[in-house]
Amino acid sequence: LQYFKEPAPQQRIIATPGQNTHIPVWLLGSSLFSAQLAAKLGLPYSFASHFAPRMLGQAIQLYRENFEPSEYLDQPYISMGVPAVVAQTDAEAEYLATSAYQRVLGLMRGQSLKLKAPVATMDGLWSPAEKMSVDNFYAMAQIGSPDTVKAGLEMLLEKYDVDEFIFTCDIYDTDKRI
């Protein structure tokens, strides 16, 4: 973090560009270690629950309990990653989400991560065990109509009391994504 400040007289490494930029630095992590480090450094913490949701609750608690105020932040500040697919209807959103499911399936199989066109059904594309793994990967996903997603986000906010959401949106059709 020192590299983003005014260089010290004996400092051998100078961030260029970067020095004296005073950019906000966050720690993005998906583990309890990253939560502890963000707390110790007094940095805002962004939990990568958009792909690794399993330890979200524990990490948030650990971060809050161990937070040390710093020159960067007076109190804990947390964001969480949320995969989101929003469409006019729940059915359309579920259809569009099959592109994201196929991407994670490819990741698990060591195949291409290129986003694929949505499919009418994932049946036959994944085994029951693979479906369970994809479901776990997307445990925080909010997929549906605007009302459905709003209700889901309100539930996440109530449960985790985060300050911000960061969204990932794996939708094949650019017009639908925007």
Predicted regions and their residues:
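Aromatic- and glycine-enriched pocket-lining scaffold segments that form the walls
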Residues: L1-E6, Q10-L43
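An alpha-helical appendage that flanks or caps ligand/catalytic pockets
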Residues: L1-I14, R54-D161
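Hydrophobic faces of well-ordered beta-strands that scaffold small-molecule active sites
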Residues: V25-L28, Y45-A48, P76-P83, F165-F167
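A conserved active-site cap/scaffold subdomain adjacent to cofactor or substrate pockets
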Residues: S31-R54, A59-I60, R64
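Short catalytic/ligand-binding loop motif for oxyanion handling, primarily in non-cytosolic enzymes
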Residues: S34-A35, A87-D90, T174-K176
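Glycine-rich, proline-tolerant flexible connector loops at the mouths of alpha/beta enzymes
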Residues: F51, T168-R177
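Conserved active-site loop/cleft motifs that coordinate metal ions or position small ligands
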Residues: L157, D163-D170
